[in-house]
């Protein structure tokens, strides 16, 4: 049933495949590299795969889209836009320098590179191929990524001891005296906190931006790359399945198997 549907609706299946590929592209396009900065320090964000002087680079900030422009590098000239929110500088090496950062600097920064240099053709980039890279900057007092703290519950151990004592006098009347002594021992261990240690973070961030790492946990950049790899693998699998169904390979194999088994030739309904 599925084979017949795909055979009779090839165009719809192809459109659906194109939509899936476009959605995956948008997801990968909007994925940003996490970067952390400490209040009062400078943070440098680097453009990637730039070959001066023909390549052009644009820096902007803001969530989604083109955002607000900061710098434009065109050949040997640099254009800097006035901005009252940030104190920044456009460096000659196509990098963006954020000066004396505060929590207000915590936002998304994007760089778009127009690869016009002929050397990019070696990598099959083609003409006017653009490479977009974005950084998700987080600024705090420690200059480290937020860590989680777990608190163990307090345990109390109670121990009770009972002692019985009998006293007898010289009279004929015997008096039994029972004394109960209770001793209670309380054990109150101090609560333990498991806090992941802070790691040093390099503020000069490029394409190989390194995020703060915690013990037994992958870094945010590794998680970022792993997510990209999974999306690419999913797209490749979907494309392979669509190609197999588009050329009716399962149906042809089924007819070939019927011919070898029964010695008859079956004509598919799509060829009638």
From Swiss-Prot:
Signal sequence bounds: 1-31
Annotated GO CC locations: host cell endoplasmic reticulum; host cell plasma membrane; membrane
Matching InterPro entries: Ig-like_dom_sf (IPR036179), Ig-like_fold (IPR013783)
Localization terms from the record: Host cell membrane; Host endoplasmic reticulum
Membrane topology: Single-pass type I membrane protein
Source organism superkingdom: Viruses
Keyword Thylakoid listed: no
Sugar attachment sites: 42, 93, 100, 142
Stretches of the chain found on the membrane's Extracellular side: 32-224
Bilayer-spanning residue ranges: 225-245
Keywords: Glycoprotein, Host cell membrane, Host endoplasmic reticulum, Host membrane, Membrane, Signal, Transmembrane, Transmembrane helix
Cytoplasmic side: 246-272
Low complexity composition-biased segments: 147-183
Disordered as annotated region, ranges: 142-200
Processing after translation: Glycosylated.
Family of the protein in this entry: Belongs to the RL11 family.
Main function: Plays a role in the modulation of host immune response by modulating T-cell function. Interacts with host PTPRC/CD45 and thereby reduces host TCR signaling and T-cell proliferation.
Subunit structure: Interacts with host PTPRC; this interaction affects T-cell signaling.
Protein name from the UniProt record: Protein UL11
Protein's organism: Human cytomegalovirus (strain Merlin)
